[in-house]
Amino acid sequence: MRASGILMPISSLPSPYGIGTMGQQARQFVDFLSQAGQAYWQILPICPTSYGDSPYQSFSTYAGNPYFIDLDTLAAQGLLKPKEYKHIDWQCTPEQINYGALYEKRYAVLRTACERLLASPPADYRDFVRKNRFWLPDYALFMALKDAHGGACWQEWEHPLRQREPDALKAARRTYAKDIAFWQAVQYLFYTQWQALKAYANDKHIQIIGDLPIYIALDSVDVWSSPQDFQLDADLNPTEVAGCPPDGFSATGQLWGNPLYDWDAMAQNGYAWWVRRIRHMCSTYDVVRIDHFRGFAGYYAIPYGNKTAEGGRWRTGPGYALFAAIKKKLGEPRIIAEDLGFLTEDVNALLRKCGYPGMKVLEFGFDSRDGGDYRPHGYPTNSIAYVGTHDNEPVNGWMATAAPEDVARAVRYLNLTKQEGYHWGMMRGIWASAAELSIVQAQDLLGLGHEARMNTPSTLGGNWCWRA
């Protein structure tokens, strides 16, 4: 059965506390989806944000973003008093998040709540810690150590900690026991609220599509705790990093800077690191969108230290062997493959063999340079249709900034009119396609423009801030 849904980041939900949370406004959004006949809510990664505020560059692939914890829910549980947070000025506007203010003010409030939680832990607290022992203790220690080192990257820590020498880790766990307990308690609060929100959505017949970045940030507990799974030298610096080559959209390419996986090492244990990661994501979401799927067929490797993506080389990825290992352990997880960008036959062949639906972005369909595959009359059933993703302009922004000939092509193709509204006409275009699922950005439903764009790739500042 064909279905539709809306892309709305949790961070963008309305809230009086500076950023969207998993509280009343999230449940009201679920109610709206249900009443509107929608079947899916797509979100961006829910992991903690760090430098640059991008959810795709996180300290942890498993942890939840503390900013999303709803303060009113904590107050209802007796973990906070209204006077402890209602007065705070989050220094934001109704349309923009101020991440600096959140960083300065949110954690003090959460520490108060966690002190009360830990003074009398709920019955399921120890069980939560036990079930998540494959990542939570390392994460809590990592965050405690980052705080102790003024936020410095783990590569700048003392050699024994950087190299995870057992005696150094044991001593750190004693020294920072209180902080470690705080970071574990924060994750308990996050996942308790997340599972309640997901259950509420599922009860309303709304399924949640989560987002899984292919790569891990260098300054993350994931790299620090599993250096053997990444391409690092003896000093634990990357030998090469991830990105995209120069093309018609960027003369110097995209330098992401993430460390690359050591696929040969991962293959030796049946890709256990990835199996754990996918298992966790499948328990967190109903459907998982994997970002940059083409990187599993072949990935672009840039020498560490380069200032641009020029000078990189294509290298062979794990291919189907990775997904065979995942399917052997997990069955058939519901996965959407983000197969955008520079595609070659090996990528297309891998997608066909996996059987996952790929993505079609309507805005790409009218690019005079190369758009034919993205026009909706040709969308296969096994695909997910978008007008645009978080990396694209809302329709009204696209109409104002795209090349005039591209806009004219869209107007002719879809018979767009101002009377209908160009944004409604573009949404109509994907809803009328054969794709099994169509997703529209909340910004397009609201008729917003460039001011509401979520992210502009390869730029710093002003991204990830839009609020409804």
Predicted regions and their residues:
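Catalytic domains of carbohydrate-active enzymes, especially glycoside hydrolases
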Residues: Q24-T49, H280-Y285, I430
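Surface-exposed amphipathic alpha-helices with a cationic face
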Residues: S34, W194-N202, K327, L351-R352
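N-terminal regions that are enriched for targeting/export leaders
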Residues: M1-S11, R27
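Acidic, mature catalytic/reactive cores of soluble proteins
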Residues: R2, R162, N202-K204
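Active-site-adjacent substrate/metal-binding segments within catalytic domains
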Residues: I6-M8, T21, I43, A101
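Alpha-amylase-like alpha-glycosidases and glucanotransferases acting on alpha-linked glucans and related
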Residues: P9, S15, D53-Y191, I216-I439, ...
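Conserved, well-ordered alpha-helix/loop/beta-strand core segments that scaffold catalytic motifs
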Residues: W183-I216
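Outer-envelope exported proteins of Gram-negative bacteria
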Residues: L44, Q207-I209, P213, V287, ...
